[in-house]
Amino acid sequence: MAALLPELINGYSVKAFNMNSPLVQALLRGNTLTDHVLVIVQLSGGNDGLNMVIPVADYSKYYNARTNIAIPENAVLPIAGVTGTGLHPAMTGLQSLFSEGKANVVQAVGYPQPNFSHFRATDIWMSASNSRQEVFSGWAGRYLDYEYPNYPVGYPNSDMPDPLAIQIGGLTSLTLQGPTRNMGMSITNPTSFYNLISGTNDYAPNTRAGKELTYVRNINKQTQGYATVIRAAANAVTVQSPYPTGNSLADQLKIVARLIKGGLKTRVYMVSFGGFDTHSMQVNTDKVTGSHATLLGRVSAAIKAFQDDIKFLGVEDRVLGMTFSEFGRRVKSNSSTGTDHGAAAPLFLFGKYVEAGMLGVNPTIPANALVNDNVPMQYDFRSIYATILEKWFCLDKSVVQSLFPPDINTQLQVLPLLKPGACNGVTPPPPPVTNTDLLVTNFPNPFTSRTTVQFTTAGGHTLLQIFDTLGRLITVLTNQEYTAGTYRIDFDSEGLPAGLYYARFQNGITQQVRAMMKVR
């Protein structure tokens, strides 16, 4: 854990990180010629994706699984260009962004062997590790370390006078942790930040707090340079478009927009918004309002205001945003009008260069959902990161792969999330897969002990995995290069309990999930 200096310096809290901590240290580094910015919005607590992005085409199954919290079908907001799927009625702001061609929802994002602990699952998402691997650096931190390999020596400088990453409020997270040092700084109010690092010349006692104070002083000269440019950037912007009041996420995003317009070259901004651990009282009696509706409404309004503001400020060409939460919720609601920790869930991308619409299909919902049923993964979250690194930050594919653990990088997809022009060579969207385009099937289905899984590949790297309803990876049937064609592989379920299983097929930028039922 990052160690904080508990005292206040001249009345201001200064956050310094113990240099021996696995989460520690200071700022960032530049190579690739791009002025692009990524804004990461963390939804803390585990957001209920099924009540945020609602599978209207499978409404009867959705309703049967969630009778006490299901959003009324006639209240679901349609999404421009998408059929059979809608948004929670509180998300009118995001609905407008879809209509403007500036929002995308990626369905069922997750990873094999999901972890249901808030802390561990958050670490997995921030580090891009696998479920059973501890990685003490963040995916964005490793990217920044690649771009600025000599930091902190010689920074700030004329080429990069600004912080490489900024987190608004709280601690700098694992996301921004580089291999040896933290690549981000945390600020609360940019107009007063200059004051936060001044007046630190009192005697430092020989205590843990005193050592932290000495560390603050050691980085003071460097931080002083960043404080100056942050203050100048904030003061350079005097007019912004309106933001909702009483909305802490909107307050954070307003600062981000101000700093971007003010001229900072900062590559990554991170903001957070909590309260999504909705085990109980998620909805009111009308199902449309309640604690979850309030959260989603604030997220939607904040992102819409931010997007309007960066357009007003003339910087929207440079900015891409994404949301994430450490996990989704179970398919079936609980008896407390809430939902319990689950696996895969949708996430949003927003910005002028987003390929608007929906990537993926509605999640598979069992006709008679059980308490342990989870949304099966369609997209690995690390493929979202890889796409951003290659198609937004313009990195070579080999560099992107080097930023992920070796057992993951060969399975990364570059997804059709961004419009051509963000970087050269953006992958065009694949042709839509209809219900009749079954790329993966199995027979017999239901089956007792063995079933044959048939898949049709367009050629190239092909992955076929089997998951259970908890999202655990049971086996990998194949993970290799193929020539185009149709192939069959037997799946032997000997020793596995009866129940629902999912075959996940991945080929290039295409994937499908097939539900398979084992009976006694």
Please report, for each region that a protein language model flagged, where it lies by residue.
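Hydrophobic alpha-helical bundle architecture
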Residues: D309-D317, G321-D340, F348
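C-terminal outer-membrane/trafficking sorting elements
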Residues: P432-F443, F447-R520
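Feature for exported/extracytoplasmic and membrane-associated proteins, marking the mature portion
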Residues: M1-A301, A305-L313, K332, P346-C423
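Low-complexity, Pro/Thr/Ser/Gly/Ala-rich linker/spacer regions in secreted
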Residues: P420-T434
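Short, glycine/acidic-enriched loop or turn micro-motifs at the edges of active sites
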Residues: G45, S280, R329, T448, ...
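Active-site lining segments that contact anionic ligands and/or coordinate catalytic metals
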Residues: T266-V268, E316, F324, G342-A345, ...
